[in-house]
Amino acid sequence: MKLNLSSKIVLNQIPEEFYHPATAIERSEITRFEKVPTDIFPTIEEGAIDIANQLEEGIKKAAQEGRKFIMGIGSGSSLTPIFQELIKRYEAGELSFKDVVIFNAYEYFPLNAENVNRSINQLKGCFLNHIDIKAENIYTPDGTLPQDEVQEYCRQYEHLIKELGGMDVILLGIGRMGNIATNEPGSSLTSTSRLILIDETAREEMKMSFGSQETVPPCSITMGIETILSARKIFLTAWGEEKADIIKKTVEGKVTDAVPASFLQTHNDAHVVIDLPAAAKLTRIQHPWLVASCKWTDKLVRSALVWLCQITGKPILKLTNKDYNENGLSELLALYGSAYNANIKIFNDLQHTITGWPGGKPNADDTYRPERANPYPKRIIVFSPHPDDDVISMGGTLRRLVQQGHDVHVAYETSGNIAVGDEEVVRFMHFINGFNQLFGNEQDEIIKEKYKEIKTFLQSKKEGDIDSQDVRIIKGLIRRGEARTASTFNQIPLDHVHFLDLPFYESGKIEKLPMGEADVNIVRNLISTIQPHQIYVAGDLADPHGTHRKCTDAVLAALDMEKEAKAEWLKDCRVWMYRGAWAEWEIENIEMCVPISPEELRAKRNSILKHQSQMESAPFLGNDERLFWQRSEDRNRGTAELYDKLGLACYEAMEAFVEYKV
């Protein structure tokens, strides 16, 4: 069973010479915009192996010289693959850590020693407890100290690092704002170990470990920028497209305290190690024509022309030979013969992505349409990771599919219960208790007992506590009720609304259980029963909580099993990926774009508003202060505006899709 097929999705095939150049000259040419040596790998595993190789070499060299290897490390999730690779080598007898000294880069403050979320406890759990490092060789800032003793402790911590000869290497991840260790934007180049306040953005990232933002300690004791730069070698790692923007600022931007990681540009042996998704915004990956000759695919040509339109402020059909020549795209003139020919080609390609018939237009020529005309009507399943992702991400298309006569099913993959606030439970419990008093003559003792039990639990609940099973069930029921209301509003029969309640989600915590066979079998059973002609799945693979990726992996695994079983229905099924909750598709990747009128956009907003528990009081709105309906409308309007600026038809809004080839 293949449980990670989403990681195999490659929208843009990057030629190897742009991330793994064969010679030093080629590397120098394609990295001309980069100010920190940056190594890009196709997968996280390959990047982790590369760093582990260099660490192993350093550890063994230090042992041969009869000295200890001094290593600074952080505790972010981006370092876990490297730790796993090092553990594997220790278990295979290839590497020993007896002569390695570890300095923890930061610790939360104040936090008691037993708390599992302490940085050092996380490091022990994922790395240190699995190797043969001596306990006396592990040093960490102390988050249990009285505050008035912290400054002196930091001074001693700095002194100890220097006394042992300084760090041979420090291994760090990077935060969304460019923070390294917990040095936030504004940190000085000359800063040393100190107590600092954790800002809101960093707290948002840390809540994945702590369960909620409120339980993240207010401060941390961190190595300073000067301390980090004192290491003889620095590795900075990042994986995934959600880190692409900050990696570009770190590697290609100017040195600024607004991006603390950019200070690595001043170090003589700093290395950024990333995977292809994290490298997506670097010039050699996003705009390769600016650094070398390209193998021009249709997608790359489309990307180049959209970029050219944006920097010239012109629509596609007004681009001239001069525009191409002045902006590094003369190769396209040689390829197409003239700007006119290239313009027409890409204009037509984009025009053909637009359709008002997402299920296919019956009895019409579908040669240039993204979806086939037949069969009609189609059986369709829209998979929604949470009970509101369907309307947030493709509410206009969903409504259009129903109105155009297709047999539409919606499958809500998870209960979404942890995203419901406690006050919603209290409100519904008041209603149930009141209903019992009014119409049941208070005869139902179960309701009375449960009311008291749940009320007592919520009153005594502390920040970070996991909800009881009863509370999670009620929260799930609230989400189900909202999903049914929205589906009814969109004219979807309730017998076409399926609640899958995939088991991986039911951990009661932000961090979910591993997605496995039980999840896939639930999805496969639904798919094989309905045998759809169209499937819609979430393509927001960088969502901050990981639920979308796991849900999509479950669907793709189920489809792969059906393919292996040679299911006949699969030959006439297309799979479309949507986005919208956290990001939008890049225009070069869009294969179907559905226009939305002002009235349809209003209806989409109303269907999102049916999910009342996900408005202002929802626990996990992320860093974006806009409500989900506002984010959705802004993205849909942004897509329409981009098409308009390129010289195509002007619509109120548009929803975009990319096809997944089974």
Give names to the regions the model predicted.
Residues 176-198, 251-254, 549-558, 591-596:
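Short, surface-exposed, charged loop/turn segments at secondary-structure junctions
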Residues 2-12, 25, 226, 230-330:
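ATP/nucleoside-binding phosphotransfer catalytic cores, i.e., glycine-rich phosphate-binding loops
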Residues 63-92:
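Glycine-rich N-terminal segment of FAD-binding domains in flavoprotein oxidoreductases
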Residues 2-70, 366-367, 374:
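N-terminal glycine-/serine-/threonine-rich phosphate-binding loop
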Residues 181-225:
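Class I SAM-dependent methyltransferase SAM-binding "motif I" and its flanking Rossmann-like core
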Residues 13, 22-35, 95-169:
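Ligand-binding beta-strand-loop-alpha-helix segment within the catalytic cores
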Residues 82-93, 390-415, 419:
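Histidine-anchored nucleotide/phosphate-binding helix
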Residues 203-211, 215-220, 312-381, 400-404, ...:
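Metal-dependent de-N-acetylase/amidase catalytic core
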